Regions:
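Structural detector for short beta-strands of small beta-barrel domains
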Residues: 1-28, 84-123
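OB-fold (S1/OB) nucleic-acid-binding surfaces
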Residues: 24-45, 115-142
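Generic structural motif
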Residues: 15-18, 39-41, 68-70, 108, ...
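Short nucleic-acid-contacting surface segments enriched for D/E, G, S/T with interspersed K/R
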Residues: 49-66, 143-161
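C-terminal functional regions that serve as terminal interaction/effector modules
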Residues: 39, 130-133, 141, 148-149, ...
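Acidic (E/D-rich), amphipathic helical modules within compact regulatory domains
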Residues: 30-91
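OB-fold/S1-family single-stranded nucleic acid-binding modules
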Residues: 66-102, 156, 160-173
Length: 173
């Protein structure tokens, strides 16, 4: 999975645990789950390693996780603006698989008219978002009528609801 600003992404976290997933005949594990705890945080991010990017031998290590959010809903934040990660209401034991992410747009890498049919005109966007504990990527289609001026720009505050998070890389420190 390619993201245009991968080198900018990073959340310092501890790789707490792994759940390897089912073994396939080719010897790889199907959809392994990893659990990352951002430094100083109490929330545990449950992430499915869809692309087998994380070395399971890194369990227990602190490192830089490069994460990209996709799917879910995106909207402009209302005052007061906030940065952070909120677990879904059904999260148990502090583990969240589809959190709400609150952040400020750092950089817009891609902004183009979308070919996806939604209920209103939309824009495809790839951007970096400061969520307080670091920068994550966002890749999605935005309904342009939901945003002032019909788009997002650096400095915009966003709320990502029930988003899926993919991991591009985990680099131990």
């Amino acid at each position: 999975m390619h993201f245009p600003r991968t080198e900018q992404l990073g959340i310092i976290c501890r790789f707490e645990q792994q759940v390897p997933g089912q073994l396939h005949p080719d010897g790889r594990r199907y959809l392994p789950q990893i659990f990352l705890r951002p430094t100083g945080g109490s929330i545990l991010l449950g992430i499915v390693d869809r692309h087998h990017r994380v070395a399971l031998s890194d369990e227990g290590k602190v490192g830089r996780a490069r994460l990209v959010a996709s799917l879910g809903s995106v909207r402009s934040q209302r005052l007061p603006y906030r940065l952070g990660i909120l677990p879904e209401s059904a999260a148990q034991s502090g583990i969240t698989f589809m959190p709400t992410l609150l952040g400020q747009v750092h950089e817009v890498a891609t902004l183009e008219a979308s070919s996806v049919l939604l209920s209103a005109p939309s824009t495809y966007v790839e951007l970096t978002l400061n969520i307080g504990v670091g920068l994550i990527g966002l890749r999605t289609n935005l309904v342009t009528t939901d945003f002032p001026g019909g788009s997002v720009a650096p400095g915009s505050f966003l709320e990502l609801l029930r988003t899926r998070i993919d991991i591009l890389e985990f680099v131990p420190l």
